[in-house]
Amino acid sequence: MISPSLELLHSGLCKFPEVEGKMTTFKEAVTFKDVAVVFTEEELGLLDPAQRKLYRDVMLENFRNLLSVGNQPFHQDTFHFLGKEKFWKMKTTSQREGNSGGKIQIEMETVPEAGPHEEWSCQQIWEQIASDLTRSQNSIRNSSQFFKEGDVPCQIEARLSISHVQQKPYRCNECKQSFSDVSVFDLHQQSHSGEKSHTCGECGKSFCYSPALHIHQRVHMGEKCYKCDVCGKEFNQSSHLQTHQRVHTGEKPFKCGQCGKGFHSRSALNVHCKLHTGEKPYNCEECGKAFIHDSQLQEHQRIHTGEKPFKCDICGKSFRVRSRLNRHSMVHTGEKPFRCDTCGKNFRQRSALNSHSMVHIEEKPYKCEQCGKGFICRRDFCKHQMVHTGEKPYNCKECGKTFRWSSCLLNHQQVHSGQKSFKCEECGKGFYTNSRRSSHQRSHNGEKPYNCEECGKDYKRRLDLEFHQRVHTGERPYNCKECGKSFGWASCLLKHQRLHSGEKPFKCEECGKRFTQSSQLHSHQTCHTGEKLYKCEQCEKGYNSKFNLDMHQRVHGGERPYNCKECGKSFGWASCLLKHQRLHSGEKPLKSGVWEEIYSEFTASFTSVSLCGRKAI
């Protein structure tokens, strides 16, 4: 493999005086300044860390070639990749046999590796160059006993600047930066008045020097010549591949000095360290929110602009962040690269695997101070707290409906657009979200992976299991402000509040009758059609709702999953348990007026079902 610096040399970005034979005669003395390329701090800031390292390597190689032009050029095959501790090692061998038969061997010191994401500033790069330049010059000076007069162009050695290692006497009047080498100082001064004459044809970005333009153009070319042997992922820079491979090996060489946490890259460590210092230097001009990293600010600003530059080629869905597009793409491919070692379950995201792992160790580090409920991850804890505060910060611009979470708003907005991007392969039914499609697919295969440890009941969705478990725990976090009644689920509270307000938003188009719940409307509509979709396999009795079928099947199975903690009596239905518990608590049912309204509505609905059933017969 040819080194990045040699690649630049071969592409014509950096050119040196041609060597004719064994010696080169210069009409004018060649200095390092003549072959160096300088970036301004602004231009250098546009390069990623790997490109900065490449720039540094090119500059180092410039003066190495300058030192060796009086001798045979060094061999390309003397470059060796050293892996973790050192990046490139170059042995520049110049051999000349004088009359004394002596041999000259000049070995440049190994350039230490910069971490794949280490931020090299202009000053650091040029100090490294100046330091290596001085070492190389001393090597020639120490080996001068092997040369005869005229063997090496004296002008080169004479014009190579000698660095002041301990001092920095050269100070820039523009930016007050100091330098130890006069050549580096001269080159730096050019950066303040540099004309940007090299323009990118793709995006119009301008640069002072052609090498900077060529490095930038690789972003548009999209060339990815470095491939991971483990997962096949491709990268356009070898340093990015090295960082990625640490994900597979688990290597985290960059440790935080305060908390000891390890990271794959130095840039990730630098971002983490700002958590300890509280530094957030990047501020949003729209809302004033501050961020640790500039990339976080750029992603946040897209919320204000509405920009979603990352589009899925399969379904056309757009995203603000590339990582979310990558995560979304796995929905179409079915890829789940993160596997739980305990139960073998696979996940699309490492964070989901980490959250799942806590299920096995039963650790719930985040506790709600109001209700005492524990949570595995902080995100779920923050979501839960909105239940108590009633906060709903996400508004639908179409209908004004508010939501606690952005994901719920996104799902709701698809109702207005009518877009159902997730199709069931079995029956072709469309769904707004992948989770709903996954839940639906379990109706085809009968899978119920979520099991209640109390009563052994199985559920298709985790949410259904969590709702069911509240029956056993007695948890009722949702309170009615009108009558003080508490409920286990927000949907039950909403339905109950309609009794106080008298709201009946669900209307039958056949007879005009209105209902407080959509399920009541669906059950009522079967009266007009006479349809009974749900059949009992044991007695073949038909029902117009699955709920009624489930209730009926308990008659055959003798199932009584609801137990009274006071006396141990068991019941087939939660409503029967609730009524029974009032005997122990002395709780009175709803006020007569409200109860009469519920009863009249129930009997009317029941009567209409019965009448329609008789007509169907």
UniProtKB/Swiss-Prot annotation:
GO biological process: regulation of DNA-templated transcription
Family annotation (SUPFAM superfamilies): beta-beta-alpha zinc fingers (SSF57667), KRAB domain (Kruppel-associated box) (SSF109640)
Keywords assigned: DNA-binding, Metal-binding, Nucleus, Repeat, Transcription, Transcription regulation, Zinc, Zinc-finger
UniProt cross-references to SMART domains, sorted A to Z: KRAB (SM00349), ZnF_C2H2 (SM00355)
GO cellular component: nucleus
Cell compartments where the protein resides: Nucleus
PROSITE patterns found in the cross-reference section: KRAB, ZINC_FINGER_C2H2_1, ZINC_FINGER_C2H2_2
GO molecular function: DNA-binding transcription factor activity, RNA polymerase II-specific; RNA polymerase II cis-regulatory region sequence-specific DNA binding; zinc ion binding
InterPro entries given in the database record: KRAB (IPR001909), KRAB_dom_sf (IPR036051), Znf_C2H2_sf (IPR036236), Znf_C2H2_type (IPR013087)
UniProt superkingdom: Eukaryota
Main location: nucleus
Domain KRAB: 30-100
ZnF endpoints (C2H2-type): 170-192, 198-220, 226-248, 254-276, 282-304, 310-332, 338-360, 366-388, 394-416, 422-444, 450-472, 478-500, 506-528, 534-556, 562-584
Signal peptide bounds: none
Protein purpose: May be involved in transcriptional regulation.
Family, as annotated: Belongs to the krueppel C2H2-type zinc-finger protein family.
PANTHER family per UniProt: ZINC FINGER AND BTB DOMAIN-CONTAINING, ZINC FINGER PROTEIN 358-RELATED
The protein's name: Zinc finger protein 221
Gene name linked to the record: ZNF221
